[in-house]
């Protein structure tokens, strides 16, 4: 059985004042993690040993089924969960600890001194890895390579090269993971790592929902994530088990995303996700940027109609889509033991992907928002195989988009420089109202939203 815990309301009452919080945690955590609550912190730390023990028990079957001998812990902080990793001596021969705060470094370095061959320590901000990538691109530096120097490298089709554990509340972090797979840079250049993360419910729902939730939540990012990754929900973990504390959610009438932001605000979702081993069979690596642009461009509005949009690139292609003699191949759940009724509200099961999962009865009124991720992948595969593809204006638009990527100010705003903002789009801080620990030094000019 899992250790007993206090209810959310009782635990919150126990530490409702700043003084009580500081009294309990000041020995292990710096004041800036205790002094004020945040909307949604990008970096989070396990607050106590009881929480670490609960999480360890949730992850027991996942660790046991993994043959990986390398694990990376993000922001290990006071080391509560690190102790459980150290106890798995027969499994984890290498433990990489990445820490972004100076306060915790002396204690973490002690672990390296005790286990010099097994524990490797790096100071750096993994959650903001996209910033390091951008800085390296600007000055030819090696920040990313240095931070990941202890990570074993494997071929993409091999088994996973490491497990990554942490608590992350940063939406740009997950967008960077998508871009890393698409453009074969950064983390996934070293192999397919499996991530086990505690994350805010709105982000997980946004990434794993289907079109039944509505066009405001089911975004191009949702489609890309589900095409690229296999995902599995593990458990809900109490938000009060993590520092810094979070402000109480108070819905506003003007919020477009109230129904998502109000789901389980007192919890984080413990989930795992891994890049698909057969990704390059579904879409060749050199075609991944084209797939990315195809989805981004056509989801400028999910109400865009498929045939009129594609005929802008390949005139007269509509009849090929309407009259399709090929039989469709269905997709199946990757984890059959995962019961849909036990999944978080609005999230869906991870399924296999197919390039022959045709949307039934496509017509001139069918919208891109009607298609599921596997059906979008199938549509792109059809489009890619047409003889007109090589001479289509799509490739010129793609080339222009990639050129803009090279000059974009920073990765979270790449889409603004590459495609039109999505109709009635929700910005990153609307999907999850996060607070960045490092304020931007230069205001970024944003385009006005396009109306369709």
UniProtKB/Swiss-Prot annotation:
Annotated localization: Mitochondrion
Chain positions recorded as S-adenosyl-L-methionine binding sites: 46, 99, 125
Broadest EC class assigned to this enzyme: transferase
An annotated Gene Ontology molecular function: rRNA (adenine-N6,N6-)-dimethyltransferase activity
Assigned keywords, A-Z: Methyltransferase, Mitochondrion, RNA-binding, rRNA processing, S-adenosyl-L-methionine, Transcription, Transcription regulation, Transferase, Transit peptide
Biased composition (Acidic residues): 421-436
Bridged cysteine pairs (disulfide): none
Chief place where the protein resides: mitochondrion
Pfam families: RrnaAD
Matches recorded under InterPro entries: KsgA/Erm, SAM-dependent_MTases_sf
E.C. number(s) listed in UniProt: 2.1.1.-
One GO cellular component, as annotated: mitochondrion
SUPFAM superfamilies referenced in this protein's UniProt entry, alphabetically: S-adenosyl-L-methionine-dependent methyltransferases
Span list, region Disordered: 408-452
Matching PROSITE patterns: SAM_RNA_A_N6_MT
A GO BP entry: rRNA methylation
PANTHER family (UniProt xref): DIMETHYLADENOSINE TRANSFERASE, DIMETHYLADENOSINE TRANSFERASE 2, MITOCHONDRIAL
Family membership: Belongs to the class I-like SAM-binding methyltransferase superfamily. rRNA adenine N(6)-methyltransferase family. KsgA subfamily.
Free-text function comment from the UniProt entry: Probable S-adenosyl-L-methionine-dependent methyltransferase which specifically dimethylates mitochondrial 12S rRNA at the conserved stem loop. Also required for basal transcription of mitochondrial DNA. Also regulates mitochondrial DNA copy number. Stimulates transcription independently of the methyltransferase activity.
UniProt name for this protein: Dimethyladenosine transferase 2, mitochondrial
Native source species: Drosophila melanogaster (Fruit fly)
Gene that this polypeptide is encoded by: mtTFB2
């Amino acid at each position: 059985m899992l250790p007993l815990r206090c209810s959310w309301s009782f635990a919150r009452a126990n530490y409702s004042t700043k003084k009580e919080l500081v009294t309990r945690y000041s020995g292990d955590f710096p004041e800036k993690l205790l002094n004020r609550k945040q909307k949604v912190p990008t970096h989070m730390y396990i607050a106590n040993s009881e929480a670490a023990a609960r999480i360890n028990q949730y992850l027991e079957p996942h660790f046991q089924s993994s043959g990986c001998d390398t694990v990376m812990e993000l922001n290990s902080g006071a080391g509560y969960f690190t102790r459980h990793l150290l106890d798995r001596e027969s499994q984890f021969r290498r433990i990489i600890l990445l820490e972004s705060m100076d306060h915790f470094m002396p204690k973490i370095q002690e672990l390296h001194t005790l286990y010099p061959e097994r524990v490797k320590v790096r100071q750096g901000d993994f959650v903001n890895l996209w910033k390091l990538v951008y800085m390296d691109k600007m000055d030819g530096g090696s920040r990313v390579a240095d931070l990941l120097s202890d990570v074993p490298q494997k071929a993409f089709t091999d088994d996973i090269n490491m497990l990554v554990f942490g608590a992350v509340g940063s939406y740009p972090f997950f967008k960077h993971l998508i871009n890393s797979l698409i453009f074969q840079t950064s983390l996934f250049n070293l192999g397919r790592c499996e991530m086990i993360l505690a994350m805010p419910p709105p982000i997980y729902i946004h990434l794993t929902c289907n079109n039944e939730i509505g066009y405001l939540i089911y975004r191009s990012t949702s489609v890309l994530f589900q095409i690229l990754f296999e995902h599995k929900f593990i458990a809900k973990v109490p938000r009060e088990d993590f520092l810094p504390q979070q402000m109480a959610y108070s819905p506003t009438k003007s919020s477009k995303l109230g129904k998502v932001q109000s789901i389980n605000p007192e919890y984080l979702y413990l989930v795992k996700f891994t890049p698909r081993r057969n990704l390059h069979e579904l879409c060749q690596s050199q075609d991944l940027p084209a797939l990315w642009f195809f989805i981004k461009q056509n989801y400028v509005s999910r109400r865009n109609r498929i045939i009129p949009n594609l005929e802008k690139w390949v005139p007269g292609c509509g009849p090929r889509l309407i009259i399709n003699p090929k039989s469709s191949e269905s997709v199946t759940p990757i984890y059959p033991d995962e019961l849909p009724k036990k999944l978080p509200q609005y999230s869906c099961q991870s399924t296999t992907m197919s390039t022959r999962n045709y949307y039934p009865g496509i017509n001139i009124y069918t919208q891109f928002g009607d298609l599921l991720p596997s059906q979008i992948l199938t549509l792109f595969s059809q489009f890619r195989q047409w003889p007109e593809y090589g001479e289509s204006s799509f490739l010129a638009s793609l080339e222009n988009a990639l050129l803009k990527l090279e000059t974009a100010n920073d990765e979270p705003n790449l889409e603004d420089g590459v495609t039109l903002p999505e109709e009635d789009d929700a910005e990153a801080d609307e999907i999850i109202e996060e607070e960045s620990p490092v304020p931007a030094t230069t205001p970024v000019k944003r385009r006005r939203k396009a109306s369709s």
